[in-house]
């Protein structure tokens, strides 16, 4: 049986924490006892998440041990480096749980997709996860700390999706990146896993036409879209020692879609 407060001593860094899956992950990790460093490109959104957790909402005033909001563009190496420095300065330790949820879509058919739309999605969804994974791992290794890194991919990274060449490529890359990181970092006591959501009710999927959603729902054996909390459940398991011998895994949270 899973024990309560499985993450009582953990410091968790969550990117994309201002909405959707990232916010749900932040809430769930906090309920399990973790202190959450909630990061988002939108500082106000990150602060709102921290307010929901009962924290301070700004890295400038939060004492060590309080849930705290941070702002960073994960596609920029300097910003990610500063983020890890700020988190460590605030809490006097590196995050032992790192969850990369930051992502975006710029959908278009392959024949019409612009180079800018391709580049931006790859920069945030794939390069951003590389930068966060690298910086977090460097901080953990230099401190001699164990950790769990969880990267949010997508089932689309395995099967593709019409109109999402850039998104599918970025999410497929996340799977390969995470598996390789798991091979390299295991000897340091750092586990790396990816979570592959299916169609989840988030601000991102709210842009999808209803007729498309109806078609997708008809393909899901469980008969409905997932909730962000469903993804948060999987992330929490991978963050905890309940999954202590799991690394390099890709956990699908899809309701059975594309089995």
Swiss-Prot record:
Its EC number is 1.1.1.n12, 1.1.1.62, 1.1.1.239. It comes from the Eukaryota. This is (3R)-3-hydroxyacyl-CoA dehydrogenase. Belongs to the short-chain dehydrogenases/reductases (SDR) family. CDD domains: BKR_SDR_c (cd05333). The modification N6-succinyllysine is found at residues 158, 171. The lineage of its organism: Eukaryota, Metazoa, Chordata, Craniata, Vertebrata. Disulfide bonds: none annotated. It is found in: Mitochondrion matrix. The active site is at residue 167. The gene is HSD17B8. SMART domains: PKS_KR (SM00822). GO terms for molecular function: (3R)-hydroxyacyl-CoA dehydrogenase (NAD+) activity; estradiol 17-beta-dehydrogenase [NAD(P)+] activity; NADH binding; quinone binding; testosterone dehydrogenase (NAD+) activity. GO terms for biological process: androgen metabolic process; estrogen biosynthetic process; fatty acid biosynthetic process; protein heterotetramerization. It is an enzyme of class 1 (oxidoreductase). Heterotetramer with CBR4; contains two molecules of HSD17B8 and CBR4. Substrate binds at residue 154. Pfam families: adh_short_C2. Keywords: Fatty acid biosynthesis, Fatty acid metabolism, Lipid biosynthesis, Lipid metabolism, Mitochondrion, NAD, Oxidoreductase, Phosphoprotein, Steroid biosynthesis. Pathway: Steroid biosynthesis; estrogen biosynthesis; Lipid metabolism; fatty acid biosynthesis; Lipid metabolism; mitochondrial fatty acid beta-oxidation. Required for the solubility and assembly of the heterotetramer 3-ketoacyl-[acyl carrier protein] (ACP) reductase functional complex (KAR or KAR1) that forms part of the mitochondrial fatty acid synthase (mtFAS). Alpha-subunit of the KAR complex that acts as scaffold protein required for the stability of carbonyl reductase type-4 (CBR4, beta-subunit of the KAR complex) and for its 3-ketoacyl-ACP reductase activity, thereby participating in mitochondrial fatty acid biosynthesis.
